[in-house]
Amino acid sequence: MKTKVILSQQMASAIIAAGQEEAQKNNWSVSIAVADDGGHLLALSRMDDCAPIAAYISQEKARTAALGRRETKGYEEMVNNGRTAFVTAPLLTSLEGGVPVVVDGQIIGAVGVSGLTGAQDAQVAKAAAAVLAK
């Protein structure tokens, strides 16, 4: 029988805190969303001075990374390389900044970050997701 780690509220809070720490270290203001492996929102934080729309975008990035079991950067690259049909895919945000959360080799959810450039969003998301690997 397989066992599965479940992304708890405590874990989601730790992910948010790690993402905020990375953002603050760089004087950035972002929105950070954490979703379970089904793409359902568990936690959301929009830092001071972050645009309100970033809260929505971060949730969509987290959901896409959770359901797709991959970084959202891959979808953005597909679109940029000519696979434009991906922009019409339901429940898919093809913007960099969504990263799966992996524990013991299993994807247990995802974190999405918005408010900066795609690369900066991804930097914060990766730092946030890495907190559970420690």
From Swiss-Prot:
Induction: Part of the glcDEFGB operon, which is induced by growth on glycolate, under the positive control of GlcC. Also induced by growth on acetate. Expression of the glc operon is strongly dependent on the integration host factor (IHF) and is repressed by the global respiratory regulator ArcA-P. Pfam families: HbpS-like (PF03928). Disruption phenotype: No effect on glycolate utilization. InterPro entries: GlcG_carb_metab_protein (IPR052517), PduO/GlcC-like (IPR005624), PduO/GlcC-like_sf (IPR038084). Gene3D superfamilies: Haem-degrading domain (3.30.450.150). It comes from the Bacteria. SUPFAM superfamilies: GlcG-like (SSF143744). Transmembrane segments: none annotated. Belongs to the GlcG family. PANTHER family: PROTEIN GLCG, SLR1406 PROTEIN. This is Protein GlcG. It comes from Escherichia coli (strain K12). The gene is glcG.
